[in-house]
């Protein structure tokens, strides 16, 4: 708890009294939303005591605090992953820091592979539920300051916000889909056999992030909204020796950043 308080205090001292309402986690290749934040304060992760540093492709490693759609937001321009060697405790740290800074909502985004054959590259999918194949970030002593020992995840992703997002998508003529996100450790992409298995158990999108952040956010009582950008279609035929590439994932995500920015901005305006 001391590390969380120390990190939060370090950030708070640089905010000039601002209190963010919304925390935003920007996934691979999706960091450009931070460029749309007005009157920004940039806080590099490497200047925050006890904070990890992003090493993944497409993750710049900054907190950006400022105004978006008339609301004060704090955006993570880059997240942390289990495959980088960080503990679940460190993956939970940024969410808890943002909670101490005052956020009430957490918006998460990621670049994901499609297990659902109806999804195609550059589709934007609203996350309605998830399947966790990672260690749970709440294992260990419970931090009562944040929440109960056994939090309920029946409604991990806020239904009211999801409905607003679908209405906005319809208004803006976006072909938004909904799906279940499956989180595995990475850093390897899935084998064709794994893809077939994950699809059988109900997965629509496959990725290596997001779920630990959502679990911690719900433990903290935050309302959560999530979006996956489809950047690759999972290989189930095993016909090609090389099928997935991290640089291509980032490039594909970058092509749809504008669409995601519009959705997030309109949603935040309505909070």
Residue ranges and their predicted role:
Residues 131, 135-187:
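Histidine/lysine/aspartate-rich catalytic loop segments that bind and position anionic ligands
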Residues 104, 204, 223:
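Short acidic/polar active-site loop segments enriched in Thr and Asp
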Residues 208-247:
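Zn-dependent metallopeptidase/amidohydrolase metal-coordination segment
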Residues 10, 14-17, 160, 164-175, ...:
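Generic non-transmembrane alpha-helical segments
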Residues 167-204, 264, 271:
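Active-site/ligand-binding-proximal alpha/beta "capping" segment
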Residues 1-153:
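Metabolite-binding pocket within alpha/beta catalytic cores that recognizes anionic/polar moieties
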Residues 235-271:
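His/Asp/Glu-rich mid-to-C-terminal helical/loop segments that flank catalytic regions of hydrolases
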Residues 98-102, 199, 218:
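Non-catalytic positions within long, well-ordered alpha-helices that form the structural scaffold/packing
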């Amino acid at each position: 708890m001391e590390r969380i308080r120390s990190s939060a205090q370090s950030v708070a001292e640089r905010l000039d009294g601002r209190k963010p309402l919304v925390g935003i986690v920007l996934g691979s290749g999706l960091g450009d939303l931070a460029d749309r934040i007005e009157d920004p304060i940039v806080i590099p992760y490497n200047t925050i005591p006890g904070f990890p540093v992003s090493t993944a492709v497409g993750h710049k490693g900054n907190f950006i605090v400022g105004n978006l759609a008339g609301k004060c937001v704090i955006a993570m321009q880059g997240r942390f992953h289990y495959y980088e060697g960080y503990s679940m405790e460190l993956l939970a740290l940024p969410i808890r820091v943002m909670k101490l800074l005052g956020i009430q909502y957490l918006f998460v985004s990621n670049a994901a592979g499609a297990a659902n054959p109806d999804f195609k590259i550059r589709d934007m999918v609203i996350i309605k539920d998830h399947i966790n194949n990672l260690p749970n970030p709440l294992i260990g002593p419970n931090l009562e300051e944040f929440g109960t020992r056994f939090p309920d995840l029946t409604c991990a992703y806020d239904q009211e916000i999801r409905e607003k997002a679908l209405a906005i998508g319809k208004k803006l003529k976006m072909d938004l889909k909904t799906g279940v996100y499956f989180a595995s450790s990475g850093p390897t992409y899935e084998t064709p056999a794994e893809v077939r298995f994950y699809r059988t158990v109900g997965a629509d999108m496959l990725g290596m992030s997001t779920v630990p952040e959502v679990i911690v956010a719900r433990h903290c009582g935050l309302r959560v909204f999530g979006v996956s950008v489809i950047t690759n279609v999972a290989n189930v035929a095993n016909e090609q020796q090389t099928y997935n590439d991290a640089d291509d994932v980032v490039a594909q995500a970058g092509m749809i950043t504008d669409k995601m920015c519009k959705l997030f901005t309109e949603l935040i305006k309505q909070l």
